[in-house]
Curated annotation (Swiss-Prot):
Protein name: CASP-like protein 1D2
Subunit structure: Homodimer and heterodimers.
Extracellular side: 52-73, 130-161
Keyword terms of this UniProt record: Cell membrane, Glycoprotein, Membrane, Transmembrane, Transmembrane helix
Glycosylation-annotated residues: 52
Compartments reported by the entry: Cell membrane
Family (UniProt): Belongs to the Casparian strip membrane proteins (CASP) family.
Keyword Membrane in record: yes
InterPro entries: CASP/CASPL, CASP_dom, CASPL
GO cellular component, one term: plasma membrane
Length: 193
């Protein structure tokens, strides 16, 4: 009886001498996005740190009353989180530049980037949400709680700085989402089909 098997064995289990596909190289876009993340972090920190304004408030006597980011723990956390994000983006930009010359490191580095980018995204999102909540209270106040009055009609420059800083941080979080997507897609394109 003749065998119907091919001489090479089952093609599913045959080892191939061809290397796995290299995938499309998106490291140039990765470096650009990481630089944008650094720029967004830096701008957001500089804008909120320079958000100082002093106004004369009329209580029984006119008293100068300053508004600074240091007076709110939410804004301090915002500055700390975006400073960490800026440092992280510098380190990962340099790692991307170094790995672009070494193809063997790219896939492994992409996996680490996905994990760390997701962590940084959580930090940016929590800091932006916290600062946004306090900024909203400054803009609208809360008439149900004594002492939580609107302040943005008095401290207009301070509120504009805080709002601009939060908007730039939101842009940074979108950039981080794009970095995660780009790393995941790069890994997916390297998987043999």
């Amino acid at each position: 009886m003749a065998s119907t098997d091919k001489p090479g064995g089952d093609p599913e289990y045959r080892t191939s001498s061809t290397p796995a596909p290299a995938g499309v190289d998106y490291f140039k876009f990765d470096v650009i996005l990481r630089f944008l993340l650094f720029a967004a972090s830096l701008v957001a920190v500089v804008v909120i740190v320079t958000a100082n304004q002093t106004e004369v408030i009329r209580v029984p006597q006119p008293v100068p009353w300053p508004a600074k980011f240091r007076y709110s723990p939410a804004f301090v956390y915002f500055v700390a989180a975006l400073s960490v994000t800026g440092l992280y983006s510098i380190i990962t930009t340099l790692a991307s530049l170094l790995a672009s010359n070494k193809p063997a490191l790219k896939t492994k580095l992409l996996l680490y980037f996905i994990l760390w980018d997701a962590l940084i995204l959580g930090i940016i999102a929590s800091a932006t949400g916290t600062a946004g909540g306090v900024a909203y209270l400054g803009l609208k106040g809360n008439r149900h709680v004594v002492g939580w009055n609107k302040i943005c009609h008095v401290y207009d420059k301070f509120c504009r700085h805080v709002g601009a800083s939060i908007a730039v941080a939101l842009f940074g979080s979108v950039v981080t989402v794009l970095l995660i997507w780009l790393s995941a897609y790069s890994i997916h394109s390297r998987v043999p089909k």
